[in-house]
Curated annotation (Swiss-Prot):
Residues 2-105 form the Thioredoxin domain. It is found in: Nucleus; Cytoplasm; Secreted. In the fully reduced protein, both Cys-69 and Cys-73 are nitrosylated in response to nitric oxide (NO). When two disulfide bonds are present in the protein, only Cys-73 is nitrosylated. Cys-73 can serve as donor for nitrosylation of target proteins. This is Thioredoxin. Homodimer; disulfide-linked. Interacts with TXNIP through the redox-active site. Interacts with MAP3K5 and CASP3. Interacts with APEX1; the interaction stimulates the FOS/JUN AP-1 DNA-binding activity in a redox-dependent manner. One of its GO terms (cellular component) is nucleus. The lineage of its organism: Eukaryota, Metazoa, Chordata, Craniata, Vertebrata. Belongs to the thioredoxin family. One of its GO terms (molecular function) is protein-disulfide reductase activity. CDD domains: TRX_family. The keyword Secreted applies.
Length: 105
């Protein structure tokens, strides 16, 4: 399941409550073509990797979170463990997304 993040507080809360689990954050926008293309794959990964926390941040709805995380383009995927960023890449690259998850779990 992918959790939709709608505030800076909800983002921090989600990172904190994840504990030891890997957190994957998809920074996207409704008007972004590549974001729409990879979204179903991101959701399917959330079903496949039940021990990983998947979050989705709409950069237009949560500009403060996107700014704090220094997101420059969409889609950007960031990976967190114990509240610390441990990885990041931009672009709708399905293979890289799944490979990065496997590398970090």
């Amino acid at each position: 399941m992918v959790k939709q993040i709608e505030s800076k507080y909800a983002f921090q809360e989600a990172l904190n409550s994840a504990g030891e689990k890997l957190v994957v954050v998809d920074f996207s926008a409704t008007w972004c073509g590549p974001c729409k293309m990879i979204k179903p794959f991101f959701h399917s990964l959330s079903e496949k990797y039940s021990n990983v926390v998947f979050l989705e941040v709409d950069v237009d709805d949560c500009q403060d979170v996107a700014s704090e995380c220094e997101v420059k383009c969409m889609p950007t995927f960031q990976f967190f463990k114990k509240g610390q960023k441990v990885g990041e890449f931009s672009g709708a690259n399905k293979e890289k997304l799944e490979a990065t998850i496997n590398e970090l779990i």
